[in-house]
């Protein structure tokens, strides 16, 4: 039985700290441990976030070390180099693979048997690295994938259509990055096909709107990084959502980074696809309808990632 009363965050940069703050507000855990190469940074973030506890649920947030992962239910890894202006997520790979080669064995040595959630970028590649190095069951090691990208898509569509984002069902799949694919053909608003709902709201130029929205969503991280040098609040909420689904065993459908086994003609590469997620990690992948163009783009996206992983010394 996994101890979902305790979570460990490895990495206390912008994303890690914002995620712990979001998790504190959610009140999901009794304990959250912060681990960072800079112990004082972890201590400072733990102190700062802890001062918000009186406004929420009682819990314990503190700096620790890898011995703390032994009895944790979830370990979240955000540690890694930051994406710089003009740098793609894939440009980060060599820096962050090296960091993971030092982190994952430390976790494995402690006999951790919970859920390992990868958030550091490039998340699809690093999820595969973590799967290979951790020795954990495949369904217990997955990445945050395109959960944030899909939320950005739903937000953009909600603004475009003046409708609640919670009523919009649409996924971005493939790479969490430049080759990501919007699954337009399966998108709907409370069961109404997206194109029909757009027409109902007075929007008829579907192709132009789809291209514009997809480009804006894909480039949103770059736009934010140019303005404030990092993105962290949106992904923190994505981490919170994934943890809620795991802890509560919601069996919700989320587009997370998983290893493919021939689905859509894609083999032995981690990409983001909709999956049922619960307390035992990934329960199953959920097939979605793709048109020929979307399928071709998905396969190209997976080819980019597979070539990169195959080039790594693991």
Task: Describe these PLM feature segments.
Residues 2-7:
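Extreme N-terminal starter segment of soluble prokaryotic enzymes
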Residues 12-13:
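Glycine-rich Rossmann-fold phosphate-binding loop(s) that bind the pyrophosphate
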Residues 16-17:
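N-terminal Rossmann-fold NAD(P) dinucleotide-binding loop
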Residues 25-31, 135-137:
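Conserved S-adenosyl-L-methionine
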Residues 31, 35-73, 87, 306-314:
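Conserved N-terminal Rossmann-fold NAD(P) cofactor-binding segment
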Residues 54-115:
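Rossmann-like NAD(P)-binding element
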Residues 88-154:
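Rossmann-like NAD(P)(H) cofactor-binding subdomain of soluble oxidoreductases
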Residues 134-140, 149-314:
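C-terminal substrate-binding/catalytic lobe of Rossmann-fold NAD(P)-dependent dehydrogenases
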């Amino acid at each position: 039985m996994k101890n979902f009363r305790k979570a460990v965050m490895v990495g206390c940069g912008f994303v890690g700290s914002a995620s712990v703050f979001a998790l504190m507000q959610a009140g999901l855990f009794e304990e959250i441990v912060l681990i960072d190469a800079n112990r004082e940074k972890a201590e400072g973030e733990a102190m700062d976030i802890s001062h918000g506890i009186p406004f929420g649920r009682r819990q314990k947030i503190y700096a620790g070390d890898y011995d703390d992962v032994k009895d944790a239910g979830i370990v979240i890894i955000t540690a890694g180099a930051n994406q710089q202006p003009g740098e793609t997520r894939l440009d980060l790979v060599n820096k962050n693979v090296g960091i993971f080669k030092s982190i994952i064995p430390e976790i494995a040595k402690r006999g951790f048997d919970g859920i390992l959630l990868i958030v550091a970028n490039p998340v699809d590649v690093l999820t595969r690295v973590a799967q290979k190095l951790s020795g954990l069951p495949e369904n217990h090691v997955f990445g945050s994938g395109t959960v944030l990208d899909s939320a950005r898509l739903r937000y953009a569509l909600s603004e475009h259509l003046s409708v609640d984002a919670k009523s919009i069902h649409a996924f971005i799949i493939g790479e969490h990055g430049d080759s990501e694919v919007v699954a337009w053909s399966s998108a709907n608003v409370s069961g109404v096909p997206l194109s029909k709902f757009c027409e109902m709201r007075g929007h008829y130029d579907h192709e132009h709107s789809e291209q514009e929205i997809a480009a804006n969503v894909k480039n949103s991280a770059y736009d934010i990084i140019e303005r404030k040098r990092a993105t962290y609040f949106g992904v923190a909420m994505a981490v919170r959502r994934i943890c809620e689904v795991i802890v509560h065993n919601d069996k919700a459908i989320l587009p997370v980074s998983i290893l493919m086994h021939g689905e859509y003609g894609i083999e032995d590469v981690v990409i983001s696809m909709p999956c049922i997620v619960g307390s035992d990690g990934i329960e199953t992948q959920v097939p979605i309808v793709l048109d020929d163009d979307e399928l071709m783009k998905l396969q190209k996206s997976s080819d980019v990632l597979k070539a990169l992983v195959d080039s790594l010394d693991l």
